[in-house]
């Protein structure tokens, strides 16, 4: 379950940020997670909740912005949402796509009091 190690990293970032800014409470953490990252959001939230107990991040909300998997055909330039990991271009039929988005996994913002 890599979600637990991700939750651990998110918590570390939040606590370090709060300490650097003399924060007393982490209220909200904004995350950007791509469709292709393989992250199970419910598992990530559960792991974070367990790890944050007893810290200033206990009760903090995780606000997740999910980014769709998008590709661009290297032959014709068509950009599309890639569904079910089907990497064939619907316009020209070529099978070589450049990933445009969907692999993101980052902390976008932190709200600390």
Regions found by a protein language model. Give the residues of each.
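Short loop/turn motifs enriched for small/polar and acidic residues
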Residues: 32-36, 65-69, 110
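Flanking scaffold residues of small Cys/His-coordinated metal-binding clusters
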Residues: 67-68, 83-84, 102
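Cys/His-rich microdomains that often coordinate metals
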Residues: 79-80, 96
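Long, charged N-terminal interaction/targeting segments
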Residues: 1-59
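Short microdomains enriched in Cys/His and/or Lys/Arg
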Residues: 91-113
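Short, conserved loop-to-beta-strand elements that form functional interface hotspots
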Residues: 59-69, 90-91
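Short cysteine-rich clusters marking metal-coordination/redox-active sites
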Residues: 73-76, 89-92
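Cys/His-enriched microdomains
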Residues: 71, 87, 105
């Amino acid at each position: 379950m890599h979600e637990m190690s991700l939750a651990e990293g998110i918590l570390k970032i939040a606590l370090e940020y709060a300490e650097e800014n003399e924060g007393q409470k982490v209220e909200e953490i904004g995350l950007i997670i791509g469709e292709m990252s393989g992250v199970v959001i419910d598992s990530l939230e559960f792991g974070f909740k367990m790890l944050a107990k007893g810290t200033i991040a206990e009760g903090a909300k995780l606000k997740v912005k999910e980014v769709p998997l998008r590709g661009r055909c290297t032959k014709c330039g068509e950009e599309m949402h890639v569904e079910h990991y089907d990497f064939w271009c619907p316009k020209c039929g070529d099978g070589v796509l450049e990933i445009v988005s969907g692999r993101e996994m980052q902390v976008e913002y932190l709200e600390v009091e």
